[in-house]
Amino acid sequence: MESGKYRKLLNEVFGLMKGEKLDAALQESKSAARVDAVQDLMRAAIIRSSICKFNGTPYYFSGRIYEEMAWDDFGNLIYDLMRKCKMPNGDYSRVEGVLKVCKRVVAGKALKPDNAIVVFNNCVFDMN
């Protein structure tokens, strides 16, 4: 995944997380409670984001079309979201559990393409 597009997607999802709820989640004193609270915010942000799944592969909206994303890139996105939230160092060891939960969220967001629309490099043709 291109670096610029990755940063844009990271900022999109983080923008849906930040705020008072994230600040409150980071104030939790116990690591497990803090990770669970941030994980819940991450789930909600992914549900509202452009990330979805088609034929078993994650996709995201790049501004023009939905583009394919490797599962490894999705895993890196989850880790980088945790870093961007400024979670304490000990919390990163729980990233695999958070990733597992977030993958389930994406699995529930199936992309349904419209075969009546054809996308070209310079335009979109709607056959309806």
Specify the residue positions occupied by each region the protein language model found.
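Intein modules and their embedded homing endonuclease domains
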Residues: 2-128
